[in-house]
């Protein structure tokens, strides 16, 4: 139900822009094979972190709604997104419980903090950057869930991540449309390229302790181009 609401809201935004069906490259570099192997080796740890990611994503959407209460249409766009993120949180939480694991605090990687630090102060650029950072995080989550859906040795986890892919694509698609509708394509694209470089830098390096693997821990292939769904079209409604 909520997924259809998000698709409906997204479809109502900037129809002329959607008609162009431009392919937007969100991610500069793909995740590394080492990250995938680390995540496969500690599936329940990544699952716990995934639950925290869904909870935080809901909080980001709500925070943006409260920050810009006078922005017409923003609440209608982000409210169903926040609800869907919480549905995903509950889904992951239930799976953790079935597997005998409890949600617990985990030290967060520096990924989110580095992206947040790149958000400029003052409006309206703060709004643009906040939307794009949220979209970049969703895009990276989508890319890594796709890897786990394809390569996890656990059928239960392959099914979970596969089911969530369409939602993640809708989410970063929605953030793109919110930016483009308010700031235009040229401004949005230029800033996306800058923040995408920050996103790659935040994931550059090698994990010193395997137990620190997270959904957004370090591990990208520099000089390689993301493939397939990584060149996602955020203007396309994914159902």
Question: Locations of the language-model features?
Answer:
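Non-heme di-metal
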Residues: 2-239
């Amino acid at each position: 139900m909520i997924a259809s609401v998000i698709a409906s809201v997204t479809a109502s935004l900037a129809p002329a822009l959607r008609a162009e069906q431009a392919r937007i490259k969100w991610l500069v570099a793909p995740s590394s094979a080492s990250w995938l192997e680390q995540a496969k080796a500690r599936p329940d740890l990544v699952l716990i972190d995934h639950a925290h990611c869904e909870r935080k994503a809901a909080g980001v959407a709500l925070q943006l709604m409260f920050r810009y209460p006078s922005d017409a249409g923003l609440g209608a766009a982000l409210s169903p997104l926040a609800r869907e993120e919480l549905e995903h949180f509950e889904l992951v939480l239930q799976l953790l419980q079935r597997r005998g694991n409890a949600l617990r605090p985990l030290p967060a990687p520096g990924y989110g903090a580095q992206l947040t630090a790149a958000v400029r102060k003052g409006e309206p650029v703060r709004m643009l950057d906040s939307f794009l950072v949220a979209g970049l995080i969703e895009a990276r989550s989508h890319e890594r869930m796709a890897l786990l859906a394809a390569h996890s040795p656990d059928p239960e986890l392959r099914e979970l991540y596969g089911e969530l892919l369409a939602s993640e694509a809708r989410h970063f698609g929605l953030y793109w449309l919110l930016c483009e509708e308010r700031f235009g394509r040229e401004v949005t694209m230029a800033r996306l390229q800058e923040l995408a470089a920050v996103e790659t830098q935040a994931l550059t390096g090698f994990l010193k302790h395997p137990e620190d693997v997270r959904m957004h821990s370090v591990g990208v292939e520099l000089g390689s181009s993301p493939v397939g769904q990584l060149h996602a079209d955020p203007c396309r409604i994914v159902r």
